[in-house]
């Protein structure tokens, strides 16, 4: 039998944050991850709260959280103080900064808006260094979208047309720069075959990188905002972007593209390296299949696909297995389940109640708020019995819609730390009424 203090199930942002926080507290920690997480599909920014569950726009997320316990007691934020959520996010900033990936927020802790690949604006709270943080005033003479020849996952014409409709940008000239990356011809068999990873590898070559610099300087000036797809990554994306800024003296804005998202991959790689550097044990490419319980509701051990007959024991377990995309939740024709342990769920019983009649509805689809039911300590239940040493965090939780609210990142990080601290018996410092010290 393998023995640990804390075992974390899931390798997304919630899982890595939980595992890192546990190992910082001196706990022998293992993280079991099936493989690539939803971070490969993410924007690389951390959303905290763009809208309330009722649909009201939010500028100051921590102020908005204060009313959630009364209005939406089922929401994960209602089980933590706003100050704990805030400190959890700053903890993440410190962790990523140590790995060379700084994240930035506004000085007044309000939301800012990032320009999306579709040319819309999306509220978020933390962004990477080369993401333009828009509030209201635009200080640029022109906005120039970069179109890469042969790259199909970013459509500048669509983004340009959408951004022109926004009142904040109506006085700006919005244009397009067409660039060609040397070496692309050898990689593709048809005109639109390149992906972001392909271009990222090419731009490591000095000839390709210098050619991009020259083409950008030919069309853009220091008064412009150059909006380019995230095509620099594969381990050294920020280094190359800093070099690009030095050589061109241009203001750059990265937008995430169709998967794989290099902005999201940066966060996953940084968290993984941090966890391993701190001495954590990573079982990557493995899958938790089941658990063994005692009569009092304690999870005694878990079994994984790769370990076979060897059980894995821990004093406490953190379930950060994600939602539908990561198979932390599974939907069949007539029910939605948590597939590892069969935990009790919050979900509508009839399939017609899972969604709105209109796909592009102004209100949230109910199924997005389905998930595992937990108590105030983020402990789930199994057949009505509270699981004494299993804690849940991230998008496996019920009671919130991360897409509609724009709250996915904030909930993932804060509930991960809350789950770990409650697993270690620090629940008194975690109540909504009290301040939390990390």
From Swiss-Prot:
What's the catalysed reaction?
a quinone + sn-glycerol 3-phosphate = dihydroxyacetone phosphate + a quinol
The protein's required cofactors: FMN
Coiled-coil ranges from the UniProt annotation = none
- Enzyme Commission number(s) from the entry: 1.1.5.3
* Keywords, comma-separated and alphabetical: Flavoprotein, FMN, Oxidoreductase
> EC class of this enzyme?
oxidoreductase
What does the record give under GO molecular function? glycerol-3-phosphate dehydrogenase (quinone) activity
Listed InterPro entries? FAD-dep_OxRdtase_2_FAD-bd, FAD/NAD-bd_sf, G3P_DH_GlpB_su, Metab_Enz_Cyan_OpOx_G3PDH
Record's Gene Ontology CC terms?
glycerol-3-phosphate dehydrogenase (FAD) complex
UniProt-listed Gene3D superfamilies:
FAD/NAD(P)-binding domain
Q: Does the keyword Metal-binding apply?
A: no
Superkingdom of the organism of origin: Bacteria
The record's note on quaternary structure and interaction partners says: Composed of a catalytic GlpA/B dimer and of membrane bound GlpC.
* Free-text function comment from the UniProt entry: Conversion of glycerol 3-phosphate to dihydroxyacetone. Uses fumarate or nitrate as electron acceptor.
Family of the protein in this entry: Belongs to the anaerobic G-3-P dehydrogenase subunit B family.
Provide the protein name.
Anaerobic glycerol-3-phosphate dehydrogenase subunit B
Which species does the entry assign this protein to?
Vibrio vulnificus (strain YJ016)
Q: What is the lineage of its organism?
A: Bacteria, Pseudomonadati, Pseudomonadota, Gammaproteobacteria, Vibrionales
